[in-house]
Amino acid sequence: PDRAVGDDGRALGAYQIHRVYWLDAVEHEPSLKARGYEAVTDRAYAERVVLAYLSRYAKDWSIDTVARIHNGGPAGATKRRKATDGYAVKARRAFDEIKPNP
């Protein structure tokens, strides 16, 4: 999935990162710019991009909030909440499947 291309060629890598998402992350963490957008097909680099993006926009780091922001942009957890409902449910299910039992 690291070389995945989605959204009619507009999203790259396992995290399906769009160029505008990458630009927001780079603006928050300028050192990311050294590799360029196409490097989001490298999982380690893509994870740094996602963390920079979420660090910029997430007020809290709940699964619900970060999933909605990753999927719907900065307003994904607030104004565009309804548009990100499906993605948030999928993220919660995936998290619950991997979460260790106490």
Give the label of every model feature segment.
Residues 1-102:
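Catalytic glycan-binding domains that act on GlcNAc-containing polysaccharides
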